[in-house]
């Protein structure tokens, strides 16, 4: 390794470096072969093209949907401890240089690589991202009314009441805005009680109310912040006086098992808490809440020997509400398939850590950390630094 980084001046030099980086485990064999194949197929001798293809493949291997050109360090493109190479390219002219490659197209063009707003994509992943964004945007704009029964139930579910203003449902954009800017949120129950007594919002109630009124809801927060409690109360509201086909899914079998146990425990707690309100609430709604969670693959229906699933746009899932736990672990292609199989009028609730979805930021193709929330000011999104367990 040289004392100072060398300048990439030929495709042969890049080819040798790709092999070296593979041996150093900075790249995978797939990253190297993808770059070499792209250069060979498109007869592109540029060393910059080779390097960008390798970096893009590495991004996909790291669960990112694209390569933001602005993130490339020209003096150390692979973030090596001891840089071995630097790019002989003007950073200001990089986007134009990339756009001029024959294999790179603009959005809407049929090219293997797509350049959009300074982000380089494989066309397949660009299409995944666009479809997911369109569906979520449509769902985020769809609202449902809350009945007087639901308003009364909310006050029973969340005692003591936050304030008696006569308005139990909270506008989602207001809830989202206040959630993102509230720097005084505390985690211990004593502080939470003080907060309620002083008239500040009960964010668990806000989350439940906003999610009830929207087709798309995103409830985020770390472990122990009360996401499952919030969802259980929301499901009870949805089951009051109606029959809903509700399905629970998670990315893996272990995650599905954890969700099953969490919902069971939450239902038991809720039934005990609401016993004093048996005359006011239909506690039978708790029994309607499903407990068994499945994996996303099982829900969609795996077809042995095929990458396709039994459920898709032409054979949609039979459900009214889908809850996806650990949604940030669902990769972009799978989320695209899941949304494709979702009935047009079905509700969707995404649970997990702060979710970073495409179209709103260069995002991991595992998705999905901040911007489903940032994008859907019209949808229901409540981040839970500490949603209390009532």
Where are each of the predicted segments found?
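Conserved ATP-binding/catalytic motifs of P-loop helicase motor domains
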Residues: 2-182, 186-390
């Amino acid at each position: 390794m040289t004392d100072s980084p060398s300048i990439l001046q030929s495709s042969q030099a890049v080819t040798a470096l790709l092999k070296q980086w593979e041996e150093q485990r900075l790249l995978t064999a797939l990253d190297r072969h993808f770059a070499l194949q792209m250069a060979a197929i498109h007869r592109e001798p540029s060393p910059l093209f080779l390097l960008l293809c390798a970096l893009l493949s590495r991004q996909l291997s790291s669960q990112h949907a694209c390569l933001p050109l602005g993130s490339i360090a020209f003096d150390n493109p692979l973030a090596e401890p001891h840089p071995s190479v630097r790019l002989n390219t003007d950073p200001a002219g990089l986007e134009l240089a990339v756009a001029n490659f024959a294999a790179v197209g603009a959005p809407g063009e049929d090219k293997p690589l797509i350049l959009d707003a300074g982000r380089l994509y494989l066309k397949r992943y660009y299409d995944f991202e666009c479809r997911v964004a369109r569906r979520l945007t449509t769902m985020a704009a769809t609202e449902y009314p809350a009945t007087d029964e639901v308003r009364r139930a909310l006050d029973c579910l969340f005692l003591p009441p936050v304030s008696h203003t006569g308005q139990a449902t909270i506008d989602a954009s207001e809830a989202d805005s206040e959630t993102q800017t509230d720097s005084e949120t505390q985690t211990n129950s004593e502080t939470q009680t003080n907060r309620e007594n002083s008239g500040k919002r009960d964010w668990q109630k806000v989350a439940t109310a906003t999610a009830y009124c929207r087709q798309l809801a995103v409830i985020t927060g770390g472990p122990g912040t009360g996401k499952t409690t919030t969802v259980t109360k929301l499901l009870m509201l949805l089951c009051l006086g109606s029959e809903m086909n509700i399905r629970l899914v998670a990315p893996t079998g272990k995650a599905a098992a954890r969700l099953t146990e969490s919902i069971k425990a939450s239902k038991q707690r809720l039934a005990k808490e609401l016993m004093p309100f048996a005359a006011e609430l239909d506690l039978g709604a708790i029994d309607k809440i499903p407990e068994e969670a499945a994996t996303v693959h099982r829900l969609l229906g795996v077809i042995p020997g095929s990458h396709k699933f039994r459920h898709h746009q032409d054979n949609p899932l039979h459900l009214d509400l889908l809850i996806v736990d650990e949604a940030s672990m669902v990769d972009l292609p799978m989320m695209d398939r899941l949304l494709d199989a979702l009935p047009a009028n079905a509700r969707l609730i995404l649970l997990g850590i702060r979710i970073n979805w495409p179209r709103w930021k260069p995002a991991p193709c595992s998705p999905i950390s901040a911007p489903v929330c940032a994008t859907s000011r019209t949808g229901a999104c409540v981040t839970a630094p500490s949603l209390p367990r009532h």
